[in-house]
Every structure is written in structure tokens, then in C-alpha cells.
């Protein structure tokens, strides 16, 4: 694990695991539990991007920059959320 990583994936025996913040940034505090991702390619360690609540990001989908994914939103395929975008209770 690199010193600059902002989260770790807590595997739950399925393909997707919950994320846990390793440091505070933006609206996220150290040790906050976030949503689900399939791998580190789904969520950047740079910027203030985060997957909140029960949101899921998987496949080749990516969240980066300062983008946020909330609620029970699902991001999959080759979808990207970036910049200051917010995805709330949507399926892309």
C-alpha cells in the first residue's frame, strides 16, 4: 500500500468490496466507510472523489477528480464520472 493512498478495499467475499478512508480529505474523514468498488481502477486516489453510501462502481467504470457517487447509484461499463460531478441514485 502506498503512503498516498486515500482508501483501502475491504473485501466481503464477493467481487465488490467496501472502501474505507485511510486519511481525511474533502467531506470524507479518516476511517469513514464508503460504497462498493470492484478494484482500485474504479476510484482514483487523487482529488476528493469518493463513492458514498451503498453506491457501486464496477467493470471499467471510473470515478476521478472531485466527483462523488451517492445513494444506491450504480456506475458500470465504460462510464466515467469526473470533474465536480455528482451522481445520485442513478444507474449508468
Protein language model features and the residues they cover:
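A detector of tandem-repeat and repeat-rich interaction/domain scaffolds
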Residues: 44-91
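Terminal amphipathic alpha-helical/low-complexity segments used for targeting or macromolecular assembly
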Residues: 1-48, 78, 84, 92
Amino acid at each position: 500500500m502506498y503512503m498516498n493512498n486515500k482508501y483501502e478495499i475491504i473485501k466481503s467475499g464477493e467481487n465488490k468490496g467496501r472502501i474505507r478512508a485511510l486519511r481525511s480529505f474533502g467531506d470524507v474523514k479518516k476511517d469513514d466507510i464508503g460504497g462498493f468498488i470492484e478494484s482500485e481502477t474504479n476510484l482514483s486516489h487523487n482529488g476528493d472523489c469518493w463513492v458514498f453510501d451503498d453506491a457501486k462502481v464496477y467493470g471499467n467504470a471510473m470515478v476521478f477528480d472531485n466527483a462523488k457517487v451517492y445513494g444506491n447509484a450504480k456506475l458500470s461499463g465504460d462510464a466515467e464520472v469526473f470533474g465536480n460531478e455528482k451522481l445520485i441514485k442513478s444507474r449508468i
